[in-house]
């Protein structure tokens, strides 16, 4: 695997919100910083995430900002239809690469 193919994964909690925002931001920052700047993908697995509130959206936006600053990519994997809709109506969908293992 070359440096350009570096991928790290992070499982999002069932509820991504006020209580979990700091933890996921810290974990994401650690993973992003562990990859060479200018390369790598951080995959946030949303398979088991059922609820995202405004604090959770804010955490995702901050993670995305960290990645952009480091020229890295954030992938949201397996978001539910509700989370996809939330990302769409808040105009955040296009900030992320969204993947489904079911595609």
PLM segments and residue spans:
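STAS-like cytosolic regulatory interaction modules
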Residues: 1-51, 62-103
